């Protein structure tokens, strides 16, 4: 009930202003009695993933809490994990405003944020400051002004800094809003990046005496052959996990709607089937060797179950969470427990 009232107010506001207000409010209330407005008790439904045990299979996707400011509030809502970021080595403002658009009739969102964040050092401070023991994945990317050919260095810098504080590290090479970024998903550039990250991971595991898994986040806009090549590279470089998928550049299911022609990545309900299809193809190619987090267009427990059936071990929500509220977490966990 509270969320429906809050949502009604927020949906009257500019989307990015509403987002910033929400994150600020959650930051202030995460560890106070005021979190009773959104906190919920969710019975455990433990799941093993990448050698870790999560209290339930529902996580918050990257992009909601880029700088890790409201982690404790999302813990109170019952998420099994939170993925913060995307974070870059240096702070950057992202793309010009406006850059976030609701497509309410389609339960969708278009964003061209462009990795706006306060930088990896600021994120590390927030990871150290969090009060709860929730599992936090850190999604890392490259700065916009770093040439793609040198992008590998940005990922290594971020990995080095977040490694001691992350439950796992997600490598984002699939955002459509950083020029040239998606080219890292193909051929030699992909292989070189994954190889360098794996080498760095093993060095850091030795240094910190703990093994932090690494996962690759991929786009939905890939051919079958491209998915096969990515899967082969993941297996070859002994990556621990995959996250499928990021937002799409297609506009299927939203044509004619206000804001549908805005550039950027489309998320939400129109992405549901495409994302599930990619998960299924990727799972087939990986053949059980590497587990998958399914994300993209989960608007109901049924959508989440379809991701599990396609081959995902865990799921993440973002747009569906904005449209449905915290109750969606509980609904998915309960459906998962019964499946």
From Swiss-Prot:
Q: Name one GO cellular component term.
A: cytoplasm
Top EC category: oxidoreductase
Q: Where in the cell is it found?
A: Cell membrane
Binding residue positions for substrate: 66, 111-115, 172, 177, 246-247
Enumerate the residues binding FMN. 62-66, 86, 139, 172, 217, 245, 268, 297, 318-319
Q: Which GO terms describe its molecular function?
A: dihydroorotate dehydrogenase (quinone) activity
Residues annotated as the enzyme's active site: 175 (nucleophile)
Q: Which UniProt keywords apply?
A: Cell membrane, Flavoprotein, FMN, Membrane, Oxidoreductase, Pyrimidine biosynthesis
PROSITE patterns in the record, alphabetically? DHODEHASE_1, DHODEHASE_2
Q: Cofactor stoichiometry and binding?
A: Binds 1 FMN per subunit.
**Cofactors, names only:** FMN
- Disulphide bonds in the chain: none
**Which GO terms fall under biological process for this protein?**
'de novo' pyrimidine nucleobase biosynthetic process; 'de novo' UMP biosynthetic process
In the bilayer, the protein is annotated as: Peripheral membrane protein
Enumerate the catalysed reactions: (S)-dihydroorotate + a quinone = orotate + a quinol
Subunit comment: Monomer.
Q: What does this protein do?
A: Catalyzes the conversion of dihydroorotate to orotate with quinone as electron acceptor.
Q: What family is this protein classified in? A: Belongs to the dihydroorotate dehydrogenase family. Type 2 subfamily.
| Name of the protein this chain belongs to | Dihydroorotate dehydrogenase (quinone)
Q: Which organism is it from?
A: Shewanella sp. (strain MR-4)
Traced from the root, the source organism's taxonomic lineage reads: Bacteria, Pseudomonadati, Pseudomonadota, Gammaproteobacteria, Alteromonadales
Q: Point out the gene that encodes the protein.
A: pyrD
């Amino acid at each position: 009930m509270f969320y429906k009232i809050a949502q009604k107010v927020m949906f009257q506001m500019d989307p990015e202003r509403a987002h910033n207000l929400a994150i600020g409010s959650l930051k202030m209330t995460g560890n106070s009695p005021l979190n009773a407005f959104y906190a919920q008790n969710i019975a455990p439904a433990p799941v093993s993933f990448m050698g870790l045990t999560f209290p339930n299979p529902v996580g918050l996707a990257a992009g909601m809490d880029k700088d890790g400011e409201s982690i404790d509030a999302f813990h109170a809502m019952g998420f099994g994990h939170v993925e913060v970021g995307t974070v870059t080595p240096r702070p950057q403002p992202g793309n010009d405003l406006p850059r976030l658009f609701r497509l309410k009739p389609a339960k969708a969102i278009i964003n061209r944020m462009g990795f706006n964040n306060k930088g990896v050092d600021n994120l590390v401070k927030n990871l150290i400051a969090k009060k709860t023991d929730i599992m936090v994945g850190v999604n890392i990317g490259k700065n916009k002004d770093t040439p793609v050919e040198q992008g590998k260095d940005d990922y290594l810098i971020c990995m080095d800094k977040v490694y001691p504080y992350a439950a796992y590290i997600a490598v984002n090479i699939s955002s459509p809003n950083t020029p040239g970024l998606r080219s890292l998903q193909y051929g030699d550039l992909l292989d070189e990046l994954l190889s360098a990250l794996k080498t760095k991971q093993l060095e850091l595991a030795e240094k910190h005496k703990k093994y932090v898994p690494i996962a690759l986040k991929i786009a939905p806009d890939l051919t079958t052959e491209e998915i096969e090549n990515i899967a082969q590279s993941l297996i070859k470089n002994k990556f621990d996990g995959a996250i499928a998928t990021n937002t799409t550049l297609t506009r299927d299911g939203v044509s004619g709607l206000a804001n549908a022609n805005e550039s950027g990545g489309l998320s939400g309900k129109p992405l549901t089937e495409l994302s599930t299809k990619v998960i299924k193809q990727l799972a087939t190619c990986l053949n059980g060797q590497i587990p998958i987090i399914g994300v993209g267009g989960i608007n109901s427990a049924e959508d989440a179950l379809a991701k599990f059936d396609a081959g995902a071990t865990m799921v993440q929500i973002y747009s569906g969470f904005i449209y449905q509220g915290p109750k969606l977490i509980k609904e998915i966990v309960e459906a998962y427990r019964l499946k």
